[in-house]
């Protein structure tokens, strides 16, 4: 059997063992994709014992390509919501998550100096303790750039594997500890979270208002400042028994009922100007109007602003809401359409059908993957990661590398959405498949390379001390920030659990947090809010630590 065939066969065996281990769960919690690493270590140990030689160049390529696939698909997935997560609504959560990252780096630096832990080993412990695989890849790459021998770079995978198990368990124990210390009632926390959403500024709501302000009588909607803004959409107007779709030029009269869509504060401000909120239904039922959701799939409208499509003027149809990547937005006239956007349309059936034809509304296209943008994005990401950033006093130039470059490029492209006929939307199933394939390939190779010396290191070497160092790196930041967030910021417990899981970019921890309450989305929301920024910082941190420690000797 050729080296290539043998290498592929061993990798396939590793993947089978890995995924089997990952599916083993105790009380609903398992290693998940982290099981791939341990399967690779097991197979790698026996491969080494048998004296089997695998293709080193092929293993290196598979490892790097797997990492690229993984981080790129993550960036495409979270890109549409990344920049939104940095706004004020998520600022507090991101600050706490960043504090966890910084504290983890400081603890790592202190342990390195006090115990003289070799640089590859301490970076591996750090990556495993925070359960972040791209950090492992970024650390290995910067070490190679610094001229570290290959056998020492491979030690990083071993120390990563030593610290990884408690990295998973540590965050679960922290959640349990917070619940015990503060005697948390999970059901009450879920209700508080729902109440805060209802009273907050993040949800799109509706309000029916009767026009009672005499100053607005016989004025066009576009001449009323509160209605001619990007914060409020007037999607229906009822006059006497007639329900209509208003246009900017529609004249409003005293007694008209307006159906407004926007955030609660903006709706309240509109009510103060216009008149009185009423309970009268403005439902399209029993009228010649209807409400329908359509999806944007036509390349010809991608990147175009809603105002430039003239749906109201041409078809007498209003877009009342826009859903992008699961987030409900006010369909402002300046909003640009992206592939996969879901539009809430109000109008007559024939008119809605006409608008649906314009925007596409081809459900089958949502399941298709444009491969050209995928490889363009990966290529640009690799180029971005290769750009050197020279910092005075540092022995080598900093780079985003193969972990950071594709991630940042994917975040940017995911946010842009489309350029001409190219769009970077990827169906969730396809994204998940590529992401899982990438991480399986990467961790399988890391495990294979580490497996030969893993058992000896654990039983006869410093494996136990590495585990101890990892416990400190995991526990100290999580417990400290958890206490600060709960005591001083009065953070909701479920939100806190999601933030802790997101700060470690740990899906098993998110699964545990979600299971704390069956119906609350608090944990998932906070996890998604901090995940993009934390993932970027987790990739950069080992590179900074490596360069700083290398320069200090």
UniProtKB/Swiss-Prot annotation:
Gene Ontology biological process terms in this record: potassium ion transport
Report the main location listed first in the record: membrane
Name which cysteines form disulfide bonds: none
Where does the signal sequence lie? none
Which subcellular locations apply to this protein?
A: Cell membrane
Q: Of which family is this protein a member?
A: Belongs to the AAE transporter (TC 2.A.81) family. YidE subfamily.
> What is this protein's record name?
Putative transport protein YidE
Q: Which organism is it from?
A: Salmonella choleraesuis (strain SC-B67)
Encoding gene per record: yidE
